[in-house]
Amino acid sequence: PIRSSAASDVYKRQIKNRGSLFSLSGEDQNITKGRLVIEELFSFADQSKDISPKEIHFFISKALNQPNESRNFKLESKSAFSLTTPKLEVIPRNQSQEDFINSISSHDISFGIGPAGTGKTYLAVAVAVNLFIQRKINKIILTRPLVEAGERLGFLPGDLAQKVDPYLQPLYDALNEMLGFETVNKFIERGNIELAPLAYMRGRTLNDAFLILDEAQNCTSMQMKMFLTRLGFNSKAVVTGDVTQIDLPSKKMSGLADAVKILEGQKGISFFHFASKDVVRHNLVQSIIEAYEKNSKNNED
């Protein structure tokens, strides 16, 4: 027998298989969810798609978020739509991700707020790349506030690329997955893709562009205003961040938290809030986030 450690550990059951036949033992509600996970994985494989640990964890997480009393639920393994990029097809992994993409599509300025692992920035990059390859925009601009350097890059050793790259690496990673390393570098050289610290956005008006501000909780209110007012004709801006992970000095107001108070409800601007249940990374990531949230609430009480 082969023990499926990922599913077995999560559901506290034994899973055995012989070829394509599986047997499950444990509590009834866990067996029901485990059966549906296995069925969805078979369905996923039937679509000629490779099953990686990422897919397994996704389906397990999806099942765990279903009510225990639900006996005949259906996991939503396939979204109604996907985002095509040159290297891969980006499919929303839960309803929140699909709603966030719809929010970006229907608003010129969109905020995605929530914990790490919910796919906020990755989805924003996917939408940007999708629009770029359709030639609906001419430029993708990705930026982050450089809190550790205080945005004073002159105090860091090396040229601009050497100084900035470590801070922007997560954005590079997403672009490389969707476009490929050589293509990303080609478009950077041509000026079609730009990755820069937030301070370098000052004084510009950006037309026919898709702007993404990542880690926005670490920009100041003035920086947030500066970024949002860079928006030109036929442009979109997406702001992502987590208001529980602010690294600014205690006396400085987070530009993201301030924007929620000032702009939420403003026509043409959307605010989408992710929850810990929307995390699509390793199951432990969701558990860790929830544990810290619980501890934070206890400290407040």
Model-derived regions: residue spans:
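Single conserved hydrophobic/aromatic residue that forms the stacking wall/gate
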Residues: P1-A7, Y11
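Long, highly charged amphipathic alpha-helices
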Residues: S5, K33-L36, E40, P170, ...
